[in-house]
Swiss-Prot record:
PROSITE patterns in the cross-refs: HD
UniProt GO BP: dGTP catabolic process
UniProt-listed PANTHER family: DEOXYNUCLEOSIDE TRIPHOSPHATE TRIPHOSPHOHYDROLASE, DEOXYNUCLEOSIDE TRIPHOSPHATE TRIPHOSPHOHYDROLASE SAMHD1
GO MF annotations in UniProt: dGTPase activity
Organism of this sequence: Methanocaldococcus jannaschii (strain ATCC 43067 / DSM 2661 / JAL-1 / JCM 10045 / NBRC 100440)
Domain HD: 50-147
Name assigned to this protein: Uncharacterized protein MJ1154
One Pfam family this sequence matches: HD
Length: 451
C-alpha cells in the first residue's frame, strides 16, 4: 500500500496492482498532458495534468462504489484509466476524428493488465454497467473531480462543491429492471451547487474568450501538419504536450510561434445564441470539421488572411437529468428544482460562434465591411434541416412523454443514443419545444419556424 498526497483529496491510497498501472508508460504519459489545455495562458497556475485528475477521479469513484455496493476494484481501475487515450492538451485536440474514448480502448487492449479483466474495464468505460455510471454519468466522479481541481488550480472559487454531502446523498434505485444512481432529497442543495459550479466554471474558465482563441489556434496548427502529411492523427495518441510543442516548433509552424509569444488572434465577430434564428443555429451546430475548414478557405480567398471560426459545442446539461429520490417517488431534478430550470436559459446564453483574425489585421478588416462580407459567405451554406424526429412530430403533432417519443423513434430505426443527441440539439436550436406538464414532458414543433 502506498499513499499519494493530493492537492484536492489529501491522502490517496493505492495498492500494488494499481501502482503497476500508474508506473506504466501509458499512464506516465498523462503527467505531461495538461488537464485544461492552453488555459494556463490566462490562468498561469493551471498547469495541472490528466495524471492527478485520473487519481482524483479514482478516489471519488471508489467512495461512491463503496456507498452503493458496486464493484470497488473494477471501479477504481476503470477510473484510473478513463483518460488514458487523451491527446496532447486534452479535449482541445480531439480533431480529425480523434476520440479519446476510442484510442483509450485501444491502449487498454495492449497494456499489461494481467491482474484485471480488460473486457470488464472497457465495458465499464462504455457505461454498460453501474460502475461505468459512477465514473461518467449524470452526476459522476469525473465531473466532481475536475470542477474541484480546475477551480483550485486556476485560482477561482467557482468550482467549489459540497462533495461530502453529495457522497452521503448518493443512492441507487431500480427502474424497468435496471439499477440506476440517484440522489436522496436531502442532497438537492448539494446537487444544485454542482450545477451552479459547472455553469460558473464554463463561463469564467472553459469558455474564456482568450482560452477559446488559443485552443482554436493550436487546433489549426495541428490540422495544418496533418493536412501536409507531416503528422498522422494516430501519432497524437502517443505524444504528450512537450512532444507536440517540440514537433510544431521544429516544423516552424507559424501558429505555434504566435502561441509561444502569446501573440494570439483576436475576436473579430461574435454571434450569440440570440443573434441566430433556429434554422441558422441548426445549420451551424451540424457543421462538421471538413465544412468548417472549407468555410475558412473561403475566408482566406476573400480576405487574404487566415480567419478562423469557432463554434462552441452545445452544452450537455447532463446534471439536469439526475434522479431525486423521496417518499413521493423518483423525479428528475428539473421537476423539483426551480434553480435547475432557471439555469437552462443561462447555459444557452453562454453558447456562441466566434470568428478570429490576427490582431494586427482587426482594424483593417473592420474598416472594410468585414461583417457583411462574412455574413454573405455564411449565407452560402447549403444545409437542409433534415431530422427524423421532426418528421415524427409533423405526423403526430404533439407527443406526451419522452419514453413514448423514444418508442416511436425506435420503430423508425433510431437508436436511443441517436434519439437523445438529436432531441437535445433540436430543443437547443429551438426547432422543437419541450415543456413539462403534469409530471411528464410534452413535445411539439415550434410553429413559429417554417420548416
Amino acid at each position: 500500500m502506498k499513499v499519494i498526497r493530493d492537492s484536492i483529496h489529501k491522502d490517496i491510497y493505492l495498492d500494488e496492482k494499481e501502482l503497476e498501472i500508474i508506473d506504466s508508460e501509458e499512464f506516465q504519459r498523462l503527467r505531461n498532458i495538461k488537464q485544461t489545455g492552453l488555459t494556463y495562458l490566462v490562468y498561469p497556475s493551471a498547469n495541472h495534468t490528466r495524471f492527478e485528475h485520473s487519481l482524483g477521479t479514482m478516489f471519488i469513484a471508489s467512495k461512491i462504489a463503496e456507498k452503493i455496493n458496486a464493484d470497488v476494484e473494477l471501479t477504481r481501475v476503470s477510473a484510473l484509466l478513463h483518460d488514458i487515450g487523451h491527446p496532447p492538451f486534452s479535449h482541445t485536440l480531439e480533431i480529425c476524428g480523434y476520440s479519446h474514448e476510442v484510442f483509450g480502448r485501444k491502449k487498454i487492449k495492449h497494456m499489461n493488465l494481467d491482474n484485471f479483466s480488460k473486457s470488464e474495464i472497457i465495458k465499464t468505460l462504455n457505461r454498460k454497467n453501474l460502475e461505468g455510471k459512477i465514473i461518467s454519468g449524470d452526476v459522476d466522479a469525473d465531473r466532481m473531480d475536475y470542477l474541484l481541481r480546475d477551480s483550485y488550480h486556476t485560482g477561482t472559487a467557482y468550482g467549489m462543491i459540497d462533495l461530502p454531502r453529495i457522497l452521503r446523498s448518493i443512492t441507487t434505485f431500480e427502474s424497468f429492471g435496471k439499477v440506476k444512481i440517484g440522489i436522496l432529497k436531502k442532497g438537492i442543495q448539494a446537487i444544485e451547487s454542482l450545477l451552479v459550479a459547472r455553469h460558473q466554471m464554463y463561463s469564467a474558465v472553459y469558455m474564456h474568450p482568450t482560452v477559446r482563441i488559443a485552443d482554436t489556434m493550436i487546433k489549426r496548427a495541428v490540422i495544418k501538419e496533418i493536412q501536409e502529411k507531416n503528422l498522422d492523427i494516430k501519432d497524437l495518441a502517443n505524444m504528450d504536450d512537450i512532444a507536440l510543442v517540440s514537433f510544431l516548433r521544429i516544423s516552424e509552424n507559424y501558429l505555434m510561434e504566435r502561441i509561444d509569444r502569446r501573440n494570439l488572434y483576436k475576436n473579430l465577430i461574435t454571434y450569440s445564441y440570440f443573434d441566430l434564428n433556429p434554422i441558422e443555429k441548426w445549420i451551424f451546430v451540424n457543421l462538421d470539421e471538413k465544412q468548417i475548414l472549407s468555410l475558412e478557405s473561403r475566408f482566406y480567398e476573400e480576405f487574404g488572411w487566415d480567419i478562423f471560426i469557432d463554434i462552441y459545442p452545445i452544452p450537455k446539461m447532463e446534471e439536469h437529468n439526475v434522479y431525486i429520490i423521496s417518499d413521493e417517488g423518483v423525479k428528475r431534478l428539473d421537476e423539483v428544482s426551480p434553480l435547475a430550470q432557471s439555469l437552462k436559459p443561462s447555459e444557452m446564453r453562454l453558447w456562441n460562434i466566434s470568428i478570429y483574425a490576427p490582431k494586427e489585421k482587426i482594424k483593417e478588416l473592420r474598416e472594410n465591411n468585414v461583417k457583411d462580407r462574412i455574413n454573405k459567405i455564411l449565407k452560402e451554406l447549403d444545409v437542409k434541416v433534415e431530422s427524423k424526429l421532426i418528421d415524427i412530430l409533423k405526423e403526430y403533432g404533439t407527443i406526451t412523454g419522452k419514453r413514448r417519443f423514444l418508442e416511436i423513434a425506435k420503430e423508425r430505426g433510431i437508436s436511443p443514443k441517436e434519439f437523445y443527441n438529436e432531441l437535445h440539439k433540436l430543443i437547443f436550436c429551438g426547432l422543437i419545444k419541450e415543456r413539462f406538464n403534469r409530471r411528464t414532458y410534452v413535445y411539439c414543433l415550434n410553429n413559429f419556424v417554417k420548416l
